[in-house]
Amino acid sequence: MTNQIPSASSAADFGSSKSTSVDAVPNMDKSSSVRRKNIDSNGLQQTNQIEQAESSLNAEADHSEPERYGCTPSGKVFLLPKEQENRRSILETVDPRFSKTPWDWIVISSILAQVLLFFMTTGAVRRYSMMLCFFFWRISYDAGIGFLLHMQSNHRKVVTWISDFGFFDKENHPKLYDLTKKQLISKMDSSYNYDTSPLEFNSWLVFRHFVDLILMCDFCSYILMGLAWTCWPKVNIILQFLRIFGGIALIVFNYWVKMDAHRVVRDYAWYWGDFFFLLRSSLVFNGVFELAPHPMYSVGYAGYYGMSLLTGSYAVLFASILAHAAQFGFLLFVENPHIERTYGTDINHARLSPRGEDNEFELPPEHDLVGFVNFDFTRISDVALLIIALYSIFIILLSSNSHYSQFWAIFQAFVWRFLHSIIHAFILFYQSKSKAWTKHFIRNGESAAYAWSQWKGLYNLTLNMSYISFVMAAWKLYHLPSNWTYGLVSLRHALGFGLIALHIYTSVSIYEDLGQYGWFYGDFFLPSRSPKLVYQGIYRYVNNPERFLGCSAYWGLALISSSAWIFLIAILAQLSNLAIIRLVEQPHMQKVYGNTLRKEAGISKLIKQATSEKGNILPKTVETHMKALTTSVDKVLDQTAEALEEFVNTAPPKVQELLKGTESNLRKNAQLAILKLFAPQLSSSTHFDYKLEIKGIDNNQVLLGHPITVCWTASPNHEINDWIGLYKLSDNASDLYTQTSSEGRWSAIDANGYTSHCSSIKSLSNDKNSGEVEFSGDLLFWETGTFEFRYHYGGKHLVMAKTEPFVITATSMNTTDVDEVSAYLLKSIKFCDPNITPHDGDASLCDISEGSARKLTSIIKYSFGIDLSYRVVQVDGSCSALSRRIVNSLKILQSFDGPSGAKDD
């Protein structure tokens, strides 16, 4: 059976593209997508002819029943007869109450031959005979039907062969013609007209009969094989009950999948109708098609594993696995190529990287290393990964199996997993919160695309090494079983490899759906192109498939190795994965895409429908319990997120406060000793008037970089080596003694008192009891905040006077006009270095000193919010180039703050 979904549009619409709206009926994946393209290259030219034919058919049809139309490759439109359920057709074939056609007797004889073989043989002969029968019919299905469909898809050979063989040739093969006509009419509704139906439709009906033969014999042979291999495993009663209950549940589930799939796709897709003609009616894809990708080939074979449980036979299990794998091969090599050939491939919108007018977002082609795909020996990051990986592998392979070697393997796996989780979490957390990663690279003159490129290399390195080291640890702790039939040894290995295969499939599906942009968290580092998400591929069915399926290989290797240490690392990987998704990814998606995030995935909607519809097969309590479980898990994760965020926000200030408090206590003790030493001098000077004021200040605010003039007045008995320092208001708790160093931000009041820091003296009165000093350049703080000046006595740190606290502020520049930015920088440069006076934006800044460049980057940081390295100023070499860089950086960062849209949590 196929899960390829027929067209929901008219022939005139065959060439249209798919809707990408989240609110639309969900699109199927490539093998089950809404088919829109006409297989005839001249189909668009036949639109009028098709519409006229359809109008004629509509006039004659009975409007009381829904009508469906087919379209042949030649463009002929015909009315499809009403369907008779394939279940009824199959049951009538074996039901003795109905008359039988010659073909029915062929089918019955094939089934009875297998049953007879089952009862005529015993022991090993029966078991292997039944297994051979099953494999024969499986090969007939996958290879036989596959070959026929391949030839039909590529060359229309099945229709040609059936026609050439004489099935519809009344003149040359009248008996075969009559038998065919009688057989088809007996299995169809009264609305079917053999003579007027197109050749393609009648050929499809003949093809269906061969398919039914293979399907019925395949089913019968599998049941007989299961009965032949049935045994009673030696396990306790609880496991016996779980085995039987699980087997029955899987078989019932399999039956529901098949029936629900047939309800949706009907016989047309069940029997690969679109290999012969196209259907022209709308289908609503719900039910099982929202449960899993390729449901007819994935969950549709759950009954295989149910039967394996009931029989208790590993032979049946491995035969089922082999048959299931062959079915996926059928999908891969027969159906998917037909879909792509007939309907084209879908444009994967999620894979598209952001593009815009700004060259910043013109990303190079996708050639980054993913795993070891796209490996390039000329790329140092690729070579580094290869060297580290080979070192990690060979150090384990070449070492002995001692406890030390096992410890090293476990330690290596733990460290890489821990590093991957920590680096992954913290970089993405701070990137989402403040774009810290991007700003770091912009600061050094790089682009946002370069920042993302570096993240991709780091992420791929830690991800690959976490996998490689874990595999090597599992290898080191694995012991080859001496008895594969003992206990659950074979089952552990089968489940383990199954989980590994599931992990690989999930990862490949995620990458195919998201592309490199999504795989490497592009919307954390670059602006999203679309405000909405397209839920396609595996994301149609589940939100965050990597949440659990993304760690299935860890659990698979843990089962295979049967090591407690490997289980422990698997638990660490699973918990860290859950934490990153819940604490980092989901908040970011909510922030970027807002209310357009999907509330329910396909599986959730399916369960909800199953518990709400009339006559549902699931009790309402199932939905209630699942909601309660989900709520509980989310509540725990929310509380963890709040605690983690509180820790991240409060831990650094608390640590800083603790260190500062310790330092303050030490300084206070030293302060007391110094105050006692200088107490006589202080007591003799307390009656004199010391004053300190800032000249020309408005509202106690000063612009960043602007010179500050300080007026001072001192006692006639003051010392010539008195001095004035500039400090942050929060740096000194005492008003009597300065506890922190001025770090060069001080000025002498008298040139006779010092040999340096005298150039800032603007004036000194004749009696030398008052004067002015100007703080500029290196004497200033080049950051915003609240500050104060302090007058100190006699070259010491004894405070005689202070100014009122004042605030250094920066002009907020919100413009992205290059000329305005350049003009602002020209004004600011004179405060950074008075010796540089560029007259226009193209004047050279190549000779600017490191100190002056640092001052200019401080002004840029507080005025524009762009943190640049001083080297960038020197490299750009002019205000114009620097202005363009600032504007481009602003556009990059502002693009992250666009309107909220939608993305999957």
Swiss-Prot record:
Enzyme Commission number, as recorded: 2.1.1.17
Transmembrane segments: 105-125, 129-149, 210-230, 237-257, 269-289, 314-334, 380-400, 409-429, 457-479, 494-514, 553-573
A GO-annotated cellular component: perinuclear endoplasmic reticulum
Signal peptide region: none
Record topological domains on the Cytoplasmic side: 126-128, 231-236, 290-313, 401-408, 480-493, 574-905
Bilayer topology term: Multi-pass membrane protein
Chemical reaction(s) catalysed: a 1,2-diacyl-sn-glycero-3-phosphoethanolamine + S-adenosyl-L-methionine = a 1,2-diacyl-sn-glycero-3-phospho-N-methylethanolamine + S-adenosyl-L-homocysteine + H(+)
The protein, known as: Phosphatidylethanolamine N-methyltransferase
Organism: Schizosaccharomyces pombe (strain 972 / ATCC 24843)
Gene this protein is translated from: cho2
